[in-house]
Amino acid sequence: MLILYKFPLSPISITAPLFLENCQAGFPSPAQDYVERELDLNEYCVMRPAATFFVRASGQSMTDIGLNSGDLMVVDKAESPRHGDIVIAEIEGEFTVKRLLLRPRLTLQPMNPSFSPIYPDPETLQIFGVVTSFIHKTRGE
């Protein structure tokens, strides 16, 4: 299941420092004290503002890629879906988020082995957009 509603894209540019050094996920290294540039998340996540919307995920079918219930997805309606993309699709009147597989057979693949693949009719499958990013909070509100 997917909770579908649009969040307005803000024309206001909010930037934050983007550090030159990467952050080690393994053995820590000494921190660098300088900033490479400012990062605007609108620039980073939204390539086509007129074709982009945000939607919250619901359910557990995509947890193996780190997409959890409540996460905010950035969806581009103008992006052409390709094999392997994460997409928002309509199946039997319901919206769903799944990995699109075009070969060997058209499949909407959940990224959690507890869920079964969906084999939609190619004539009726509607893709509403490609998920280009998602925001996963690591700390509760």
Report each predicted region and the residues it spans:
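Short, positionally conserved secondary-structure boundary motifs
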Residues: 1-63, 83, 94-95, 102, ...
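Compact nucleic-acid interaction/catalytic patches
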Residues: 90, 97
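Structural motif
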Residues: 70-71, 85
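C-terminal structural segments of small proteins and small subunits
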Residues: 116-121, 126-134
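Catalytic Cys-His active-site segments of thiol-dependent hydrolases/isopeptidases
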Residues: 107-113
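Short, well-ordered loop/turn sites that connect or cap secondary structure elements
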Residues: 67-68, 81
